[in-house]
């Protein structure tokens, strides 16, 4: 066969060249070192020696290039590149090949022999790429299959253990720090609906006073708190709006006072003047037939008269923190010495009093008031709120006072049912530019025209503007906000309680504690920024099991605020509807022109500093003279 003969001749020629190269290996090494050639030429000699031994079995090499030097250089380069990338040959193997190529011995050349280059030499150049891809797929699939579960499962188990470990540590660390267990295990509220005040160890004269005020059965917060307070324990009571928190702390205080009357027996702190006045009226009514001396210490009144009243040692002081702190700083020791023997201290709406929110915070004044009160071991401290904030909860985690029973916590519907079940929450979408038009027509719908309404605003300027506007539109309206004199605030609230005014436009000073049973609708003209403020606002209606509606005006930019409120109260607002009423049509037909004209008149009255009704406001000098 000519081809076989030619192949044998080629191999003989190659063998002769190989022997000559081996004999001249040192010279070649020196040339390579001087010229900087790669080790491929040295590899070429060793690979030819291997090929000479396996030439009889490899018929595919007959199609190779006649120039064995060029062919072997290309194959060697390709073999090294592929072996590095696909076969995983390490850099240490390459270093050994370089050293063996420099030595030029046959034994060193044999050490370069490996299965990977020999396999490539036996495959044809045409099929080489395909075979390499198949080998790569097999090599990739083989190690990856068992590795996947290793990397997927092991770290997850580690993370799980790490996630569980801190919880256990936190629980072990937090448990001894708590002075009391969970509220549910601390106070067992009687679930019997027929429970009476007599069963709570309330004195008969107080039961009769409660009956005279149409209070026949205790509520949940009253069932839980009254017996424990009578035992001398400090209390943190949380319950939704309109659940009778004032009675829960007033009854045990009055019962203890009647048994041992003394000067300044208790101090009650509230965040607003109107709430302080309301508590004073309720406490005096409950104290009948006993004669209780109570003093109201709030802003807007003469401090000299208040100082004289404090010096007379009244039985009970109902105050706002700011004004009482002013007396502590400025009045003499004769005025405030009676505060050092107080038996009870009550923080009503404690979440607002203890809020440390920077501007407008009452906490510094509260701390000033506590600075002259007896130490905790010599008094009872009672906290009541409708929203359990972190500041309030932190007080329950304090260590118990030595020699005293631990603080007990009674929470009734403060989180899941912060909104009464009898309250309907609704929203009304209104354009920002025509909010007043929609308000006017909403108040005149057949279902709302006779109902008592409270409209809440975020700013005193907005409340003042709506007061002017609604009066010009012939609504029976009054207002309540911090820019009004105290005497006018009391008069306006009295008019609304007596139904002389159907609508009360107010800021958040009226959002807490005020108990006006006749209120049927609460309108959020401006949406509050804090969802807890929303809870207190809508709590002015649907009190003590009565029904009520809360309607929130929603503009284009108020969606996020509404979603936050819904998440906080756990209930979604429904769209406001009234049968047979298309509010948008009524606004376009009846309100655009009329409300626009009255709006300009109201703004003009405010600019001219006129009171509601068109009378010019009296100057400060005349007010002081009176």
Swiss-Prot record:
The keyword Nucleotide-binding appears for this protein: yes
Pfam families reported for this sequence: DEAD (PF00270), Helicase_C (PF00271)
Superkingdom field: Eukaryota
Compositional bias segments (type: Basic and acidic residues): 161-173
Locations listed in the record: Nucleus, Nucleolus
Keywords: ATP-binding, Helicase, Hydrolase, Nucleotide-binding, Nucleus, Ribosome biogenesis, RNA-binding, rRNA processing
Record flagged with keyword RNA-binding: yes
One GO process term, biological-process aspect: rRNA processing
Comment block on domains: The Q motif is unique to and characteristic of the DEAD box family of RNA helicases and controls ATP binding and hydrolysis.
Homology family: Belongs to the DEAD box helicase family. DDX49/DBP8 subfamily.
Functional note: ATP-binding RNA helicase involved in 40S ribosomal subunit biogenesis and is required for the normal formation of 18S rRNAs through pre-rRNA processing at A0, A1 and A2 sites. Required for vegetative growth.
Name of the molecule in the record: ATP-dependent RNA helicase dbp-8
